[in-house]
Regions:
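Amphipathic, Lys/Arg- and hydrophobic-enriched alpha-helical face
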Residues: 25-44, 61, 121, 170-173
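Arg/Lys-rich amphipathic alpha helix in sigma70-family domain 2
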Residues: 60-67, 77-97, 110, 162
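A short pre-motif secondary-structure segment
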Residues: 131-135
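Short, charged helix-capping/linker segments at alpha-helix termini
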Residues: 13-23, 33-53, 153, 180
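Sigma70-family region 2
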Residues: 13-14, 38-42, 52-70, 89-91
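C-terminal edge and immediately downstream basic/flexible tail or linker adjoining helix-turn-helix-like DNA-binding
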Residues: 41-42, 119-123, 147-150, 164-180
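N-terminal module of bacterial RNA polymerase sigma factors
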Residues: 1-26, 30-31, 122, 169, ...
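Short, basic/polar amphipathic helix motif occurring as a linker/hinge flanking DNA-binding modules
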Residues: 2, 86-112, 177-179
């Protein structure tokens, strides 16, 4: 039976167990990279760099993990703040640029619909993308998301409702804006 995240954290804190740290990284690196990739609008190279920075920060601050929340809640909070710090350095309100994503051949209606949804999700604010990702991809509850992003529960619920409204508008053609 594999060790729980909490047990691995305890081993890292108690004896600087590199093997336990490596296991934590292997266990969570894919989820962290995917989360960051979606926040970074599918920029895999940037997501990989941010994931590496996230795990460095995790190691440096692991003694601050108290176990009052799930380890993944704590880890995704680090990832989210790492992304926000990087984003501030790049330009806080970066415009979505369709040209950087290229045009994908419309081979099937399903592929086109999925592409439209992905592009629409990319148009949401960073915070709304994070809320959607943590809720729909990671299966976190509203309370867990609020704790992870350090936001009030009402803000999380509002972001989900407003995000749904925006997506519906963009995807049903209720807006004059095109997703392209």
């Amino acid at each position: 039976m594999s060790d729980s995240d909490t047990a691995l954290v305890a081993r890292v804190i108690a004896s600087d167990d590199r093997g336990a740290f490596e296991l934590l990284v292997r266990r969570h690196q894919s989820a962290v990279r995917n989360f960051l990739r979606r926040l970074a609008r599918n920029d895999s190279e940037r997501a990989n760099d941010l994931a590496q920075e996230t795990f460095i920060k995790m190691y440096q601050g692991i003694a601050s993990y108290r176990g009052t929340a799930r380890f993944t809640t704590w880890l995704f909070r680090i990832a989210y703040h790492t992304f926000l710090n990087d984003q501030r350095g790049r330009h806080a309100n970066e415009e979505f640029n369709d040209d950087e994503h290229g045009n994908v051949a419309d081979t099937t209606a399903h592929t086109a619909d999925a592409l439209d949804v992905d592009r629409a999700l990319e148009r949401l604010s960073v915070r709304q993308r994070a809320v959607f990702d943590l809720h729909y991809k990671k299966g976190m509850t509203h309370s867990e998301i609020a704790e992870t992003l350090e936001l009030p529960l009402g803000t999380i619920k509002s972001d989900l409702v407003r995000g749904h409204e925006k997506l519906k508008e963009w995807l049903t053609g209720g807006s004059h804006e095109q997703i392209a």
